[in-house]
Amino acid sequence: MPAIFPVTGAQAAGNLATTSSYSGTFIPAVWSAKLAEKFYAASVYGEIANTSWQGEVSSMGDKVYINTAPTIQIANYQAGMNLTYQVPTPDMQELVIDKGRYFAFQINDVLEYQAKPNLMDMFAADAAEQMRIAIDSNVVYNTFSGGAAANKGATAGVKSSSYNLGTDAAPVALTGANVLTKILELASVLDEQNVPESDRYLVIDPATRTLLMQSNLAQAQFMGDATSPVRNGKIGTIDRFTVYVTNQLPKAAAGTATPWISGDGAENTVTSTGSVLKRRAIIAGHKSAITFASQITKMETVRNPNDFGDFIRSLNVYGFKVVKPESLALLIAA
């Protein structure tokens, strides 16, 4: 639909619009709730990480102190013996909310009046999707290799050392014939660490999902969940793992000298345009492995002093930490 009111210069190229019911009567709480809901429907790490401390975050720079239950010792008993009492000391870890992402855009009253469909919904959906991509990529890039040494490499398994989960120099070549076997080996590695069977997850890339669907055994064990939100990447279960598919897993070119690249390409980008990505990360773990806290701390509007319209801006702060490395495993695939 052509503009009824003429739009010139930078306004035609850059000014955006919103619904009239929100122009001049902006309600921050309404917008904040909407964005948070859409973000967590789309975020892999909102699903697989421990978010128990989410409500304690109020601003960037906050510190959340996490107490981990100590291990209670079990001793032999003989009749008449004096008991030795243990003094349990919780292990305290510090989660720093030191990351922040924002968006800011301009809404023009005249363009909003002509806009169809509802632009607030459209902008909120796009902001949530872009936030998902940025935060998911950042979190997974900085945690994917944070598991225990016994949970990765060519001799994985804290007790058996018998599972080849790949290395930078020698990634595992996945095929339709062996992909399920490697997933079962990831499960065994977690079993050897006594990781609980519930709340386990597996995060794979689309190429690995394709290999899974080419495996007859995988198809027999793979159960879709028609009621799950599509945009969180959840596609089914395999051997106690809830399986998620995402494009945000790190990748790297062949060889140990080349850096890993974040899923969105924003971190450690390879400068050579001729690099061929030959390594990819596949992550398995338990919900307790990574603590992740995110909060939309600012959502506000300011009237544009130079035009009829509003400036809308929002700040999302977050932090993450691998708190149980024994509950996180890594497969380096090719």
Where are these regions (language model features)?
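Alpha-helical scaffold segments that mediate packing/assembly in large oligomeric complexes
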Residues: 110-192, 206, 330-334
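Structured, hydrophobic secondary-structure cores that serve as assembly/anchoring elements
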Residues: 60-65, 71, 84, 91-121, ...
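Sequence/fold signature of self-assembling virion shell proteins
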Residues: 2-50, 55-73, 94-96, 114, ...
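Short Gly/aromatic-enriched secondary-structure transition segments
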Residues: 79-86, 218
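Residue-level detector of alpha-helical recognition elements and their boundaries
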Residues: 81, 141-142, 146, 258, ...
